[in-house]
Amino acid sequence: MNFEQYESAYPPRALPPGAWVTRIGPSPTGKAHIGTALQAVINRSLADGSGGAFLLRIEDTDRERFVEGAIEDLLAALDWLGIRPDESVAHGGAYGPYVQSERLPIYQAAARQLVEVGHAYYCFCTPERLESVRMAQQAAGKPTMYDRHCRNLGREEVEKRLATGEKAVVRLKVPDGTEIAFDDLARGRIAFESQTIDDSVLLKSDGFPTYHLAVVVDDHLMRVNQIIRGEEWIPSTPKHVLLYQYFGWPMPRIAHTPILRDMSRRKLSKRSGDTSITGYRVQGYLPEGLRNFLTRIIWPHPEGKDVYDHEEFVRLFKAEDLPNTGPIVDPQLLDFINGQYLRRLSSAELYTATVEYLKFLLGLHQDIIFETYHPSAPIKQTLTRAELGSFYSAFTANPTYTERVLTLEPERYKRLSDIVVSTGFFFPALFTPADPKLLAKPLGSPEKAGALLGEYLRLYRPDAAQAEWEQSVRELAHEAGVKDGKLFMTLRVAVTGREQTPPLFEVLTILGGDEVQRRLELAAAMPVSL
């Protein structure tokens, strides 16, 4: 088939004027990155806000970098984020296939058409020759570009060499002495001189296209009319401008998003931790919180809000609002925003969300490392899969009890992982008595701690009101000649095994008299020698 025949299978879309057809085109080279999530949120929102359509296209033409399972990871990550494409390999659609490796005949026909009209040419240069040219250019301090050795081969010679089976690629024919420019919706006019643009490969010798050919052909056939992609593609855009001109197609509106940066303003990378979408899910972020954060770092709300309903972003955001400088992925801002979404949940909803989160973690079949941001280095805490399993069993054994636990100072929770690492002491099966040194720390000696705990046990009344309970502890401290706060801390450590917890009286109330007494007896009976 020639290209016109393929093109006839992709008619214009029946959409209202001003409707944007957007897309993302990730490559399946590993776990889906948080940058892909940002692109998906932006493009989905622009389509929704205009009554358009949002497509997910898998750009898998670089077979050497293809990672098995990456497509499935991407689909699961977007589904968790609540970003559903209108068309994709999973959702179908009238403009597929949505995987580039399934569209090879289309690209091959497009490349042949470009050659036939003189806008591209066959190149027979071997890898060895290309490497020799590259090294010579580097030695001379020149840009490394193809030297156009095959650009002016005669038609007869080309056909003869192809007929003998000689391997060839198809290269873009870049014009000489021309300015190639485009209007970026967020950055304004960007121009390149044609002598700085390489005669790039469009079709490889194995029949697979490069990004340049595939993305232009697909965006045209799928009727994409607004492209939002990362700024790393700005140097490639003049090649795409030429291709649109050579094919005689209108070029979509285009804007480039800046690269995400870490707190040191370096490009976000693995040194910043796990930057995959799944990695953020592991850390306990809600999809709503992560979506809000991603929109917040690229768009200032008109009223200066950090937290807002996503519908506001969809209604107000335009591609022209995109920033030119790299957004900072600030973990503290993300924690703040996510914490606000957690506080919107009732205790029952928070319980359900935590249970689903635990099921997800257990389904990974691995130990989990929770990370908390610190300027010098992340604070890490590891839970084995066995420990997670034990926590899940205890957490779900009595939902009514667990929901009472979750009502205590919900503002402490910034992520669902905070619940996992901070509430274990509430469950008898998970409680571990404090280290004797920690128990002795407030009062200065294990003997004094043991004696006062024993005395407190004789006074302890589970049914006492808070004021009465506090007064009894203060009187005991006064009689023993110690500060109130030190005795309260000793009781806290004895009952919870920790120095930091929600208000102690509320903890005692939830645990119940029998469990509190059991723990106090354990603490009072600890060896006095350390």
From Swiss-Prot:
Gene3D superfamilies reported in the protein's UniProt record: 1.10.10.350, HUPs
Motif ('KMSKS' region): 267-271
HAMAP family: Glu_tRNA_synth_type1
Domain of life: Bacteria
Keywords linked to the UniProt accession: Aminoacyl-tRNA synthetase, ATP-binding, Cytoplasm, Ligase, Nucleotide-binding, Protein biosynthesis
PANTHER family reported for this sequence: GLUTAMATE--TRNA LIGASE, GLUTAMATE--TRNA LIGASE, MITOCHONDRIAL-RELATED
Coiled-coil segments: none
Name of the protein in question: Glutamate--tRNA ligase
GO cellular component: cytosol
Lineage: Bacteria, Bacillati, Cyanobacteriota, Cyanophyceae, Gloeobacterales
